[in-house]
Every structure is written in C-alpha cells, then in structure tokens.
Amino acid sequence: MRISVKAPAKINLTLDVLAKRPDGYHEVEMVMTTVDLADRVDMTLREDGEITLDCSASFVPDDIRNHAYKAATLMKAKFQVRQGVHLYIDKQIPVAAGLAGGSSDAAATLRGLNQLWNLGLTRDELAKIGAEIGSDVPFCVYGGTALATGRGEQIAHLGAPAPCWVILAKPPIGVSTPDVYGNLRVAQIDNHPDTKQMLQAIATQDFSLMCQSLGNVLENVTLSLHPQVRQIKDLMIASGADGVLMSGSGPTVFALVQKEAKVHRIYNALRGFVKDVFVVRMLGAQEGEILA
C-alpha cells in the first residue's frame, strides 16, 4: 500500500519573540500561512518493520536528523506498530530557508502514517505528537492560516488572508535557526510587529493593512549576518512590491503583490540576482490533503 501527501511551505506574516523560556525555547507569537509551493511525501508500507527514507535532494539526511524520519520513528514507537514504512520525499521547498520544509515533511508523514497504519488519530492528536518533533510541526499538521503561540505549538485557526501573489526569493545560503535565536537579544528588540493589527487585516481581508502589519523580529539578526538578504529586500521594494518580509529565521524573503503586472517585473528583477525564485499563492484555508 502506498500513500502520497502534500507538504506545503509556510511563510510568517508576523514573528514576534516575547521572552526566553526556562526550558530553553522562546515564547513566540506568530501569524503563519501556507503557500502552494510544496514537497510531496510518498509512503510505502513495509512488512519487515523497517523505516527507510530517500529524497530527491541528495544532501537531505536520511536518518533521525530528518524530521520526517523522526516522525515515523516516533509514531511507530508510540503506537507499537509492527509494520514499517519507506518514505520518499520529492523536495521542492528549499532547505534551511525559513519556509518550514522539514517541519512540513514531518507533518505530512504524521498525516500519511495515520492512514497507512490505520491509527485513527485526530488532527489535534497528530499536532500534539508533532510538537515533540519541532515547534513548527503542529502548525504544519493543520496548514491554512493561524496564530501560533507558546513555543509555536499552540494553534488558533484564522480565516483566509486577502488574495494576492507571493514571490519567494532565497539567496544561495542556508541559515541555522538556533544560530539566529542565539544572536537575538530579547530585551533589546525594538521592532515588535503589531500582531493584533495583522489579525484585524486577515479578519477583514484588508490587503493594504496586511502589508503594513508585516513584521519579523528575527529579520535584523539575519540581515546583520547575511547582507544578501537585505539586497533581496531592497530589490523587491524598488521593483514595486506592496509588502516585503523575511520568513522565519530566513534567508528567504517574500513579496506580497496584488497586481499581476507587477509580479512579472519583480520576478524578472529577482531572477537576475538569485536562482531560487518562486511565484505562489496563499492556500488560505486548512490544507495538507492526502493525494492517493
């Protein structure tokens, strides 16, 4: 038996860090939404009980360092499943990009194995398991648009934002999320986003207010470490983007654009500067369907 599950990328419309927690994590407040750039995770039942993984990108780890592998190992142990699984990840989301590709692969694996192994778990139960793998995994289990709080595992679902084009551009570097958080001085943050205003913008589908409300406290840290990120931001703004922000810990930057004519201009300007440029749409509602 074989199942395929889409694993969409996410972008942060806001990312705020409120405090460093005693457990070493940070208390965050983030508005996130999934976009239609997606990996695909194929899962094939193994009767020998083994868990194996292959990926279309050769540099992606195929062991416990991989979030999807970790998800399968956790599910098998937690529910004492006799069978195993072979995972194949068709990688379309750039790695170490601030787009939660690894977390989304893990979430897709949880959803797929729930069906493949006939576990009968709810999305809420899967999200709780996902929190043991990584802070972005619970959001990725649900998809759509949501406010994430706590260390990212507490999810409040939101309606769809105003429809628009999203242009993603990733410079040819990887960014370590622990390194970015390690360089963040919470007491010195002076660019906290207005999360309430963003929630209002989404509730009213106000595109202009959504662009005004974009904010990410990790952006200045990554910009100081990687000047290429600022160059991409500046190029997007100069080319007429309505709103521009770095996603997650970076280095991917996204532009929000309402008029299609602008999309081509911004895309062409970026393609002369970086290789990884994607034009996508927000998925809006909860996503992550099982394909087959």
Curated annotation (Swiss-Prot):
Signal peptide: none annotated. Pathway: Isoprenoid biosynthesis; isopentenyl diphosphate biosynthesis via DXP pathway; isopentenyl diphosphate from 1-deoxy-D-xylulose 5-phosphate: step 3/6. Its EC number is 2.7.1.148. Keywords: ATP-binding, Isoprene biosynthesis, Kinase, Nucleotide-binding, Transferase. GO terms for biological process: isopentenyl diphosphate biosynthetic process, methylerythritol 4-phosphate pathway; terpenoid biosynthetic process. The active site is at K10, D136. Belongs to the GHMP kinase family. IspE subfamily. This is 4-diphosphocytidyl-2-C-methyl-D-erythritol kinase. It comes from Brevibacillus brevis (strain 47 / JCM 6285 / NBRC 100599).
